[in-house]
Amino acid sequence: MKIAIGCDHIVTNEKMAVSDFLKSKGYDVIDCGTYDHTRTHYPIFGKKVGEAVVNEQADLGVCICGTGVGINNAVNKVPGIRSALVRDMTTALYAKEELNANVIGFGGKITGELLMCDIIDAFIKAEYKETEENKKLIAKIAHLESHHASQEDPDFFTEFLERWDRGEYHD
């Protein structure tokens, strides 16, 4: 199994520890960078991990930045990626088993290396439990990736704003 991994400069050491762990378990690791502590931008490496997964160069991906929020948002912009930002085993297993997540994201300054490694190991071993409900949910998520001309309409949210002004939504 091939695992793509990427990070920003803040968590290069953590990424290398995770990479070494994966290699010790017999996985092939595709290191998408960054490779040092020179200041860089996490979207670059989230995109690289996502592209490696959707282009089938890797089976799964791991993204790490300081909090995990930025790189996870970036990788989720790659069509075909379903990434979950996790800090615990339950969330990681749910993401894989119910939503067929193909990337997992971490805050390397939030979650310790050993816990990340344990969670990643369980995530890799977990299997998607296909059900009609799960398939429908994943299809709805995938539909959000589609480009719709209506989204470019400057009045796209007008209806909702008017409802807000009329008090139809609760705070």
Swiss-Prot record:
Catalytic activity: aldehydo-D-galactose 6-phosphate = keto-D-tagatose 6-phosphate
Entry keyword Isomerase: yes
Pathway recorded for this protein: Carbohydrate metabolism; D-galactose 6-phosphate degradation; D-tagatose 6-phosphate from D-galactose 6-phosphate: step 1/1
Domain of life: Bacteria
NCBIfam families in UniProt: lacB, PRK05571.1, PRK08622.1, PRK12615.1, rpiB_lacA_lacB
Oligomeric form and interacting partners: Heteromultimeric protein consisting of LacA and LacB.
Name of the protein this chain belongs to: Galactose-6-phosphate isomerase subunit LacB 1
Originating species: Streptococcus pyogenes serotype M18 (strain MGAS8232)
Source organism phylogeny: Bacteria, Bacillati, Bacillota, Bacilli, Lactobacillales
